[in-house]
């Protein structure tokens, strides 16, 4: 059953991609959806069965049914498909594991992927390359499953590279668009930085641990030199920064919105961008012995969350607003990892996947219904034309804002509380930025809701006349994701983040000094717990007031000089792209040009074949000049040679203190004769 879960997506991708002309458009859609759905259901069944969650969940007393507790028995299943590398020093196997970390991730990836496949049936109905699109989606899901279930770092790396390549193909699916080409190349090259760091981490890891298997590596960090562990931790962090879009390697994600909207939902909500956080969560035994790395992770995560939230304030593309929201939420996940709260980071990763996929698919429904318009300033009043889409997007937005008792509430607010519960500089820094970010998130989220659905219509009349809710294949994914955005956090929060839950006892390691869940739960003042919620409420009310009742205030705010500078700074994304283009990329290209000009076509020619032939030719020509045919010249050569020989023999006497001065004069006289003879030789040769 395990192999069926893994390889069914590949079967669907292979048949749809290579046999698409035979199975047809409808056949490719049905086949890929069926394969992904089967894998998702099997992964859910396997997750429930190995942890015995089906038994003992409820107790009955009379007519009342009580929820008792999660009753699970830890089980870690390994499947070995054979040896990949077998040498004297290392053995690497094609091995997969199914445990308490991999199965929740696997189910989330497969289930959301199925919903996105189903959504794409209608969304991509008029595209001429449907088979290729569904093949890419299924192939991406397959590689993500490989990444999640790999039992060693090298199998994980296969999935890591696979999703990188397929994400390039998906972002560049409409390859006739120049902007799609640029976005795909940017995403691919930025992720290569992370891939290089991850590769170097493996090269450091192998001699340090002697293995790449998780079971071996995770048992040894306490006995390894801390400098080595810190280096490995930093390299893993760089890899995660590129894949999970953390500053300064964040710039690829907003541009990747050039791909189809289902791609945005699959890659930038549920799967690819969470791969970096999954890598760090999986490597918790290494990071726990590298406190410097944890400090850096916390600062980077908090800074990314705040940075993306401020940039999201001024975006006008509906997909880019949600993209910056994704970067901001990824910052929360990374921040939780830096605080050593890996289970909370994992919970937020899974919870976020549902409501962010809902927001992306809701945006896709709006774009599809409104004539492919993506600028929120050209919309407005769509609540009357797309009431169902408005309802589900409102649910996703409220869950994103950690509204009490919705899915996002059980992880996002807890991350901020845990930051305060650290009682450290990094914890305070994370708490302040996390709380402010919560308010900013509320503002730009309800700015989107207001401009798209609530304000007066600002679009083309024909677009409004043609607007309508999509077919059932769009409504079902939105409805299911909305249900998960409401209830999934409530149902699973005690399992993932509940005090006393040992669900991750055998898969996540937290150093005893870093456990702060009790402090965050019981020692915090109520005001510090409520502060993020207060900021969120303030941001919501402020956005609703400004864009529905006083829209001219924003215009007047931006029209003054300071407002223009701030707006330009935020709209320019802190000028990261300008810095990269002017000071890194252009300088790198110039350096490469100089290398090509001076070395590839200059120095190499001088010291290569051309240079060697020139040296030999000039040397032979100079030697030929010595053959003058004049006897006196030959006599001079003989004299010069003898004098040189005498000088070589007697030269050491110049520094010998036991030799008389008369002998030193004789030696200097011989040297003078050599110089004169050489001078005469030069004159005669002319």
Swiss-Prot record:
Keyword DNA damage applies: no
Entry membrane topology: Multi-pass membrane protein
Gene3D superfamilies assigned: 1.20.5.2700
Superkingdom of the source species: Eukaryota
Reactions mediated catalytically: a ubiquinone + NADH + 5 H(+)(in) = a ubiquinol + NAD(+) + 4 H(+)(out)
Annotated GO biological process: ATP synthesis coupled electron transport; electron transport coupled proton transport
EC number in record: 7.1.1.2
Enzyme class: translocase
Main location: mitochondrion
GO molecular function: NADH dehydrogenase (ubiquinone) activity
Pfam hit, one: Proton_antipo_M
Subcellular location: Mitochondrion inner membrane
UniProt KW keywords: Electron transport, Membrane, Mitochondrion, Mitochondrion inner membrane, NAD, Respiratory chain, Translocase, Transmembrane, Transmembrane helix, Transport, Ubiquinone
Transmembrane segments: 3-23, 40-60, 101-121, 139-159, 160-180, 198-218, 222-242, 261-281, 293-313, 321-341, 350-370, 382-402, 432-452, 472-492, 526-546, 635-655, 665-685
Cellular component terms (Gene Ontology): mitochondrial inner membrane
Stated role: Core subunit of the mitochondrial membrane respiratory chain NADH dehydrogenase (Complex I) that is believed to belong to the minimal assembly required for catalysis. Complex I functions in the transfer of electrons from NADH to the respiratory chain. The immediate electron acceptor for the enzyme is believed to be ubiquinone.
Family assignment from sequence similarity: Belongs to the complex I subunit 5 family.
NCBIfam families registered for this protein in UniProt: NDH_I_L, PRK06590.1
Stated name of the protein: NADH-ubiquinone oxidoreductase chain 5
Species the sequence originates in: Schizophyllum commune (Split gill fungus)
Annotated gene: ND5
């Amino acid at each position: 059953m395990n192999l069926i879960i893994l390889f069914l997506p590949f079967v669907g991708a292979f048949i749809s991609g290579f046999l698409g002309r035979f199975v047809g458009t409808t056949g490719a859609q049905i086949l890929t959806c069926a394969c992904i759905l089967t894998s998702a259901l099997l992964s859910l069944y396997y997750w429930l069965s190995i942890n015995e969650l089906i038994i003992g969940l409820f107790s009955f007393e009379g007519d009342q049914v009580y929820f008792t507790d999660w009753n699970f028995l830890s089980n870690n299943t390994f499947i070995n498909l054979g040896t990949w590398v077998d040498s004297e020093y290392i053995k690497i196997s094609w091995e997969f594991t199914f445990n308490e970390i991999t199965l929740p991730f696997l189910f989330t990836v497969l289930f959301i992927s199925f919903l996105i496949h189903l959504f794409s049936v209608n969304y991509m109905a008029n595209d001429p390359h449907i088979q290729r699109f569904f093949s890419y989606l299924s192939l991406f899901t397959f590689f993500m499953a490989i990444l999640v279930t790999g039992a060693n770092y090298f199998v994980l790396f296969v999935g890591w590279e696979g999703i990188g390549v397929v994400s390039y193909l998906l972002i560049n699916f409409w390859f006739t668009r120049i902007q799609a080409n640029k976005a795909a190349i940017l995403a691919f090259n930025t992720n290569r930085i992370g891939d290089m760091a991850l590769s170097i981490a493996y090269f450091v890891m192998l001699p340090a641990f002697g293995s790449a298997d998780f079971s071996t590596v995770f048992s040894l960090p306490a006995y390894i030199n801390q400098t080595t562990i810190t280096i490995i931790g930093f390299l893993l962090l760089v890899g995660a920064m590129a894949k999970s879009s953390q500053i300064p390697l964040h710039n690829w994600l907003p541009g990747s919105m050039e791909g189809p909207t289902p791609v945005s939902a699959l890659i930038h909500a549920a799967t690819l961008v969470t791969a970096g956080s999954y890598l760090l969560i999986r490597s918790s035994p290494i990071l726990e012995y590298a406190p410097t790395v944890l400090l850096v992770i916390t600062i980077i995560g908090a800074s990314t969350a705040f940075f993306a939230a401020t940039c999201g304030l001024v975006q006008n593309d509906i997909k880019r607003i949600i993209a910056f929201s994704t970067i901001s939420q990824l910052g929360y996940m990374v921040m939780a990892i830096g605080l050593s709260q890996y289970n909370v980071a994992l919970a937020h990763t899974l919870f976020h996947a549902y409501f962010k996929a809902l927001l992306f698919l809701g945006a896709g429904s709006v774009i599809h219904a409104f004539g492919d318009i993506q600028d929120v300033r050209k919309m407005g009043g769509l609540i009357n034309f797309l009431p169902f889409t408005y309802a589900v997007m409102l649910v996703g937005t409220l869950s994103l804002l950690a509204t009490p008792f919705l899915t996002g509430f059980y992880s996002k607010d807890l991350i901020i509380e845990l930051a305060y519960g650290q009682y450290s500089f990094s914890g305070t820094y994370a708490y302040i930025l996390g709380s402010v970010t919560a308010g900013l998130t509320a503002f730009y989220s309800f700015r989107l809701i207001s401009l798209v659905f609530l304000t007066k219509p600002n679009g083309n009349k024909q677009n409004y006349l043609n607007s309508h809710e999509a077919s059932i294949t769009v409504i079902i994914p939105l409805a299911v994701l909305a249900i998960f955005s409401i209830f999934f956090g409530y149902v699973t929060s005690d399992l993932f983040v509940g005090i006393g839950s040992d669900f991750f006892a055998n898969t996540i390691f937290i150093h005893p000094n870093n456990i702060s869940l009790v402090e965050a739960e019981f020692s915090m003042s109520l005001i510090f717990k409520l502060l993020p919620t207060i900021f969120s409420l303030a941001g919501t009310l402020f956005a609703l007031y400004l864009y529905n009742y006083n829209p001219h205030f924003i215009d007047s705010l931006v029209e003054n000089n300071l407002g223009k500078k701030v707006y330009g700074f935020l709209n320019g994304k802190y000028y990261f792209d300008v810095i990269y283009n002017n000071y890194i990329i252009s300088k790198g290209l110039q350096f490469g040009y100089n290398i090509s000009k001076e070395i590839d076509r200059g120095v190499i020619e001088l010291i290569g074949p051309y240079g060697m032939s020139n040296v030999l030719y000039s040397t032979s020509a100079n030697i030929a000049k010595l053959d003058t045919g004049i006897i006196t010249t030959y006599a001079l050569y003989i004299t010069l040679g003898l004098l040189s020989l005498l000088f070589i023999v007697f030269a050491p006497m110049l520094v010998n203190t036991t030799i008389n001065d008369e002998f030193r004069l004789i030696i200097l006289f011989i040297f003078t004769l050599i110089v004169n003879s050489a001078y005469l030789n030069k004159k005669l040769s002319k």
